[in-house]
From Swiss-Prot:
Broad EC category: isomerase
List of catalytic residues: 242 (proton acceptor)
Compartments (UniProt record): Golgi apparatus, Golgi stack membrane
Native source organism of the sequence: Arabidopsis thaliana (Mouse-ear cress)
Gene: GAE3
Protein name as it appears in the record: UDP-glucuronate 4-epimerase 3
């Protein structure tokens, strides 16, 4: 007797059922309904219940959207005060991810030059939340109020735009990290795609619509082998989920620009480093492990090829961000209706000087006066690429972008900050 396969349920001739196919159309509809219901429930589970939970419920850095506290006269007063301009021609800027590495530096720079700045950050625990709190305290002393909330909270975003008619948004909030995407993929979709769409939805309905500058990533170049990387190069071969979400962000930006007249500028950052940096970046955890006497893993490419990065110092990145804000044209819509064509741009922000990771380690050894224990390993197939190299001609021409800090100088500044922050300045970098 012939064994029945799941393929045998399909009619060999359209409209003609096989003898053993007895399910009614009603039963089939119920089955389909049940299937899609399960899919829907599964998606809800992934995006709302799979996000990391704290082992300490009282830890404010791990709060969910439902527990953020905002609103009220006192809160609104702080929001207005922080966003108030100090110069006649200044901007009123909402900075998302303000307690992050780049967000902190950009917020401080904007405030120093007289712009009104309001920060927004959810203080998640992707890396040590206490570092984010320290950055927050730094900004508070500069007069920047950082609202604790999430970009997926539409009600909060709408309230912020009701209180302050922002002229610009600097969108730096994102789930960062290439390798972490293999452990928690849903967080990348939640922050980098859903969060971005939520922000754009609020911005397109605002009156006036703000001009938006946002952080894309050099990772969008993925498996591209042409160097240096140009904005005109292909970006359809992402090597990681993180890269894929950033590429998706660029396509989403194009859509909102085309339909709603939002002015959007994407910035592809190349390996940003410096004081107050991210602990998940190689230069940061290399420094930590070298000082502790732990071995560090240094990757090499195929056939012992060199792994190199276009390391870009934070002050240079900040100049590029401010240049993008200063040259951003106004959005052309209002209340969700497009009035005309709007500006849409994307720029590389790099240093144009790729440096082998082995050279970075050598510089750190000299600055820290400690010999590193090197463990050479093959580059894992988890999203990392062998090299990055930025072509910055477009940013130079249109933003006046000109990086001035070499890796030796930048790492010296980072090492001094690191030793002061973590070691009380016991070992000074020289």
């Amino acid at each position: 007797m012939k064994q029945m396969s799941h393929l045998d349920d399909i009619p060999s001739t359209p409209g003609k059922f096989k003898p053993y196919f007895h399910r009614t159309r009603w039963q089939s509809s119920v089955a389909k309904l049940a299937f899609w219901s399960l899919v829907f429930v599964g998606l809800i589970f992934i995006f709302f219940y799979r996000s990391p939970v704290s082992s300490n419920p009282a830890d404010p850095s791990r709060r969910s959207l439902r527990t953020y506290s905002w609103g009220g006269p006192a809160w609104e007063k702080r929001v207005r005060s922080s966003a108030r301009l100090r110069t006649r021609r200044g901007f009123s800027v909402l900075v998302t991810g303000a307690a992050g590495f780049v967000g902190t530096h950009v917020s401080a720079a904007l405030k120093r030059r007289g712009d009104g700045v309001l920060g927004l950050d959810n203080f998640n625990d992707y890396y040590d939340p206490s570092l984010k709190r320290a950055r927050q305290a730094l900004l508070e002393r500069s007069g920047v109020f950082v609202v604790e909330g999430d970009i997926n909270d539409a009600a909060l975003l709408k309230k912020l735009f009701e209180v302050v008619p922002f002229t610009h948004v600097m969108h730096l909030a994102a789930q960062a990290g290439v390798r972490y995407a293999m452990e928690n993929p849903s967080s990348y979709v939640h922050s980098n795609i859903a969060g971005f769409v939520n922000l754009l939805e609020v911005c397109k309905s605002a009156n006036p619509q703000p001009a938006i500058v946002w952080a894309s990533s050099s990772s969008v170049y993925g498996l591209n082998t042409k160097v240096p990387f140009s904005e005109k190069d292909r970006t359809d071969q992402p090597a990681s989920l993180y890269a894929a979400t950033k590429k998706a962000g660029e396509e989403i930006a194009h859509t909102y620009n085309h339909i709603y007249g939002l002015s959007l500028t994407g910035l592809r950052f190349f390996t940003v480093y410096g004081p107050w940096g991210r602990p998940d970046m190689a230069y940061f955890f290399f420094t930590r492990d070298i000082l502790k006497g732990k071995a560090i893993s240094i990757f090499e490419g195929v056939n012992h090829g060199t792994v190199a990065r276009d390391f870009t110092y934070i002050d240079d990145i900040v100049k590029g961000c401010l240049g993008a804000l200063d040259t951003a044209e106004k959005s052309t819509g209002s209340g969700g209706k497009k009035r005309g064509a709007a500006q849409l741009r994307v720029f590389n922000l790099g240093n144009t000087s790729p440096v082998p990771v082995t050279d970075l380690v050598t510089i750190l050894e000299r600055l820290l006066k400690v010999k590193a224990k090197r463990n050479i390993m093959k580059l894992p197939r988890n999203g990392d690429v062998q090299f990055t190299h930025a072509n910055i001609s477009s940013a130079q021409r249109e933003l006046g972008y000109k990086p001035t800090t070499d890796l030796q100088t930048g790492l010296k500044k980072f090492a001094r900050w690191y030793l002061g922050y973590y070691n009380g300045g016991k070992k000074a970098a020289s």
